[in-house]
A protein has these predicted regions:
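Key DNA-contact positions within bacterial/archaeal DNA-binding proteins
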Residues: 51, 105-106
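Short, Lys/Arg-enriched C-terminal cap helix and immediately downstream tail that follows
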Residues: 64-66, 118-125
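Membrane-proximal linker segments that couple transmembrane helices to downstream signaling/catalytic modules
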Residues: 1-95, 100, 111
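Generic structural signal for short, solvent-exposed loop/turn connectors between secondary structure elements
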Residues: 33, 125-126
Length: 126
């Protein structure tokens, strides 16, 4: 996982820690790959108010919900591309962007550069 994701669990109540575990489980099930995935959907899955979910994510991860989602999407994309490159598999970068949950290529490139420090072409030497 990209090193930018921290987990600050200090001061969480037992209930909040339970929500944290549920959030991790959902993200491990790759709910972020749905381009329409949003805070209201996550909150409904948790049966927790959206405002509280947002505050909990900010406390635990030190970032907004959408930044966290996009970080997971970039990480998924990175893992896929690394797998393809190491196995000599051809891929379509636009398809992989969509598969990662991004429905806007420009938005993807902005986040990729923000998190990885380079464009995908530079990062993977494509």
């Amino acid at each position: 996982m990209i090193e930018l994701i921290k987990h600050n669990l200090e001061g969480l109540t037992e209930k909040e820690f339970s929500y944290y575990e549920e959030i991790n489980d959902l993200f491990n099930k790759e709910v972020f790959k749905n381009p329409k995935f949003n805070l209201l959907q996550l909150s409904a899955m948790l049966d927790y108010r959206a405002l509280n979910t947002s505050k909990l994510i900010k406390h635990i991860y030190g970032m907004s919900f959408m930044t966290l989602v996009n970080l997971y999407r970039i990480n998924y994309f990175d893992n896929q591309i690394r797998n393809y490159l190491s196995n000599g598999i051809k891929f379509n970068i636009s398809q992989e962007i969509k598969e990662s949950g991004f429905n806007n290529r420009t938005y993807f490139y902005d986040y990729f550069k923000k998190f990885m420090g380079k464009s995908p072409k530079e990062y993977y030497n494509l």
